[in-house]
Amino acid sequence: MSYQYVNVVTINKVAVIEFNYGRKLNALSKVFIDDLMQALSDLNRPEIRCIILRAPSGSKVFSAGHDIHELPSGGRDPLSYDDPLRQITRMIQKFPKPIISMVEGSVWGGAFEMIMSSDLIIAASTSTFSMTPVNLGVPYNLVGIHNLTRDAGFHIVKELIFTASPITAQRALAVGILNHVVEVEELEDFTLQMAHHISEKAPLAIAVIKEELRVLGEAHTMNSDEFERIQGMRRAVYDSEDYQEGMNAFLEKRKPNFVGH
């Protein structure tokens, strides 16, 4: 099949999905995510054993994260259950084949959560990673926070979110976010070699173990009162002047003036 915003190439038992949304810096807009999800669905075939997600070679930006133009104005949850980011992270996590994120360039905001939802992350040494919701006044949701803390740990996630500052690939490797960091000229060969190696293993066993790991990773307890309390806190944020100020400042390309209400 052909797609507008991604390109798909199969190499033996490995499928490579390359982003093709450069004019928007591979932002996670609905049209892009719809194409990506359709490509994954089409690749859920027995002869495909492993998937690689990548930006085009030489990319300065792997993905800019959320498409800010698609975030709702005040009064609506910017990260609801059917948000494109929520949809693609669920699909990656539940997909029955290993998915490797091959990262070249900078990873911003929601795209960081997306790659964290994949099974392995292999990055070029020049890559950087940042979580930026506080630059926009966006109240990240519980599922997204859980996805991040499950793999990166609370203190690292707090630093990433509270500062919104990028970290290097070397530091991301040191704190356990990445599996491997290689020089950019070696990235494609290294990742393909890993994917081909995985593709020769028992696919049914891999599928069930991936699902077991997902279920174990999501095993947590929160009572309904706590959930409603957190949702109320989030609602106060996306109803706030700060949320609207963050959106306006981004679109107007200026520094936001957050006042705390």
Swiss-Prot record:
Positions that bind substrate: A64, G65, H66, D67, I68, G110, T132, K253
Disulfide feature: none
Enzyme Commission number, as recorded: 4.1.1.-
Keyword Nucleotide-binding listed: no
Entry's Gene Ontology molecular function annotations: carboxy-lyase activity; methyl/ethyl malonyl-CoA decarboxylase activity
Catalytic activity field: (R)-methylmalonyl-CoA + H(+) = propanoyl-CoA + CO2
GO biological process, one term: fatty acid beta-oxidation
Keyword Lyase: yes
Keywords: Lyase
Function: Catalyzes the decarboxylation of (R)-methylmalonyl-CoA to propionyl-CoA. Could be part of a pathway that converts succinate to propanoate.
Family recorded in the similarity comment: Belongs to the enoyl-CoA hydratase/isomerase family.
The protein's name in its UniProt record: Methylmalonyl-CoA decarboxylase
Organism: Escherichia coli (strain K12)
